[in-house]
C-alpha cells in the first residue's frame, strides 16, 4: 500500500501507537478474588417499549460446575455472586442499568443477599419457589430493604396473591405459554400495578404483539433478528457505507478508490478526521484531508476503523444494544485468539464478531451481505455456520454465542477443544465489555 500522507515520516514516528482494537484500558485487578475467577458471568439485555436497555439478567455458573444442574442453587453460589459485586464490580456489566439475578428458595432468606446493592438490583424469584410463610416473610424483608422483586416464569392466575402483592415485575415465558395465557396474565396483573415482562421474545412480531397485550419489558434475541427486506429498500447513507465497507475489505486495498468513496459520505469524513486528530496521536500539525489520514493508518487499522465507524449508520434504526453486542463479540473474539493459539488470525476474528449482526442491522440475509463485501473462506463459514464445526474460527464464534446464551455445558466442551482455560474466559468477557463501552462513547461512533 503506497502512502498518500503529506505529514512527515519523522512526525508520524513520534506519534504514540494506538489502535482501535487495542485501547489503553485498565485490566482487571491482579490477583482477582479467586471466587470470582472461578465463576462464569454473562448478561442478557432486557428492553423497554422504546427498545432502550432497562437492565440485564446476570447468569452465573461456577466454572468447576459446567455439568452441574443445580450449580446456581446453593448458598455457595450467593457467596460467588456477592464476591463478584464486591471484589470486581459487576456494575461494570450493567452500563448504569439494573441487575436481574435469579434467586432459588434457599437464597431468599440468606442474609448475605443484603450485601448486594438494593438500588439497581432486581431479585428474580424462580418458578420452583413455593409461597409458604417462610418465603413470604423473606420476600417482605427484601422488599423492606429496598430490593425490587420479580417473579420468574410465572403462569398462575389465582392463589398467589400473598406473593404477587410483594413483587413489582412478573416475567412470562412466551415459549411456554399460549397467546391466551399471555393476554390473561397481562390483563390481570397490569390492573394491579405490576409491570409485565415478556421473556424469550424471538421475533419482532412477538415484540409488537406483547406491546399490544400491555407488556412493558422484553427479553430475548428478537432485537438481533433480521426482518428481511428487498435489496432495493436499502437507501441513503446505509448504501453508501456498504460501498465503503466493500472497498475497504478488498484483498488489495486501493486508497484512491477508498478516498473517493469516503468523500461522498460527509459524516464518515468528519468521523475520520476527528479520529486521526484525537489527542492520543499527538500530531504537531492537524491532519486536514482524507488522503493524509489514510496515509497515516496501516491497512488493518483502516479496515478496522471503517468497520467500526460504519456500525452506527448501518444500525441507525436499531437498538443501541445491537451495536454494543457486535462490539463485545469483536473484542471478545480477538482476545480469545491468543489463548486459542490463533494470534495470527486475531484481525479476522475481530471482523467475525463485528459483522455477526450485519443481517439484523441491514435486514438482509447475511450470506448476501458477505458475498457483496467479498468475504469468503473460513471467515464466511464461521459467520454462516456452513463450515466444519471443528474449524478454529467457527469454534471461537460458537464459544461466544454459547457464553451469551449461558450454555455453560457447551461452552466448557468448546473451550476444552480450543484449549482455552475456563477460568480466563470471564476475564476476557469483562474486558470486552469495558472496551465496547469505551468505543461506544468515542466520537467515532457518534452520528
Where is each model-derived feature located?
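Short, well-ordered alpha-helical scaffold segments within catalytic/effector domains
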Residues: 78, 82, 132, 136, ...
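A generic secondary-structure signal
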Residues: 87-91, 141, 188, 209, ...
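Amphipathic alpha-helical segments in well-ordered regions
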Residues: 80, 84-88, 146, 357, ...
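Bacterial c-di-GMP phosphodiesterase EAL domain
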Residues: 4, 15-120, 127-130, 134, ...
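The catalytic core of metal-dependent phosphodiesterases that act on cyclic dinucleotides
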Residues: 112-223, 345-348
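Conserved alpha-helical "signature site"
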Residues: 3, 180, 202-447
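Coupling/switch/interface segments within P-loop NTPase motor domains and analogous charged loops
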Residues: 1-9
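Long, contiguous hydrophobic alpha-helical segments, chiefly transmembrane helices and signal peptides
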Residues: 40-47, 53-60, 80-81, 99-103, ...
Amino acid at each position: 500500500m503506497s502512502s498518500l500522507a503529506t505529514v512527515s515520516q519523522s512526525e508520524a514516528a513520534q506519534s504514540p501507537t494506538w489502535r482501535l482494537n487495542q485501547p489503553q484500558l485498565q485490566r482487571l485487578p491482579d490477583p482477582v478474588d479467586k471466587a470470582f475467577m472461578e465463576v462464569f458471568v454473562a448478561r442478557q439485555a432486557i428492553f423497554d417499549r422504546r427498545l432502550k436497555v432497562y437492565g440485564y439478567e446476570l447468569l452465573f455458573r461456577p466454572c468447576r460446575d459446567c455439568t452441574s444442574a443445580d450449580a446456581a442453587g446453593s448458598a455457595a453460589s450467593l457467596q460467588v455472586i456477592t464476591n463478584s459485586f464486591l471484589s470486581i464490580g459487576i456494575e461494570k456489566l450493567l452500563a448504569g442499568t439494573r441487575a436481574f439475578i435469579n434467586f432459588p428458595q434457599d437464597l431468599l432468606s440468606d442474609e448475605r443477599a443484603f450485601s448486594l446493592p438494593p438500588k439497581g438490583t432486581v431479585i428474580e424469584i424462580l418458578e420452583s419457589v413455593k409461597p409458604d410463610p417462610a418465603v413470604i416473610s423473606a420476600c417482605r424483608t427484601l422488599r423492606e430493604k429496598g430490593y425490587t422483586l420479580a417473579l420468574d416464569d410465572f403462569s398462575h392466575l389465582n392463589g398467589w396473591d400473598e406473593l404477587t402483592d410483594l413483587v413489582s415485575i412478573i416475567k412470562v415465558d412466551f415459549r411456554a405459554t399460549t397467546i391466551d395465557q399471555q393476554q390473561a396474565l397481562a390483563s390481570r396483573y397490569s390492573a394491579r400495578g405490576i409491570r409485565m415482562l415478556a421473556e424469550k421474545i424471538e421475533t419482532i412480531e412477538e415484540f409488537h404483539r406483547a406491546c399490544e397485550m400491555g407488556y412493558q419489558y422484553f427479553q430475548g434475541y428478537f432485537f438481533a433478528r433480521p426482518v428481511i427486506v428487498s435489496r432495493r429498500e436499502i437507501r441513503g447513507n446505509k448504501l453508501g457505507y456498504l460501498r465503503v465497507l466493500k472497498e475497504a475489505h478488498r484483498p488489495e486495498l486501493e486508497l484512491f478508490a477508498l478516498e473517493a468513496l469516503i468523500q461522498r459520505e460527509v459524516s464518515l469524513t468528519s468521523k475520520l478526521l476527528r479520529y486521526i486528530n484525537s489527542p492520543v496521536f499527538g500530531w504537531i500539525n492537524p491532519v486536514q484531508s482524507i488522503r493524509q489520514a489514510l496515509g497515516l493508518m496501516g491497512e488493518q487499522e483502516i479496515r478496522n476503523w471503517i468497520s467500526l465507524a460504519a456500525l452506527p449508520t448501518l444500525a441507525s434504526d436499531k437498538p443501541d444494544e445491537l451495536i454494543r453486542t457486535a462490539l463485545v463479540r469483536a473484542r471478545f473474539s480477538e482476545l480469545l485468539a491468543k489463548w486459542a493459539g490463533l494470534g495470527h488470525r486475531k484481525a479476522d476474528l475481530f471482523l467475525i464478531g463485528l459483522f455477526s449482526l450485519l443481517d439484523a442491522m441491514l435486514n438482509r440475509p447475511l450470506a448476501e451481505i458477505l458475498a457483496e463485501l467479498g468475504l469468503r473462506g473460513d471467515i464466511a463459514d464461521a459467520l454462516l455456520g456452513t463450515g466444519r464445526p471443528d474449524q478454529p474460527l467457527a469454534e471461537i464464534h460458537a464459544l461466544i454465542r454459547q457464553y451469551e446464551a449461558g450454555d455453560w455445558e457447551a461452552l466448557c466442551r468448546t473451550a476444552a477443544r480450543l484449549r482455552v482455560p475456563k477460568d480466563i474466559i470471564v476475564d476476557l468477557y469483562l474486558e470486552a465489555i469495558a472496551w465496547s463501552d469505551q468505543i461506544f462513547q468515542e466520537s467515532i461512533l457518534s452520528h
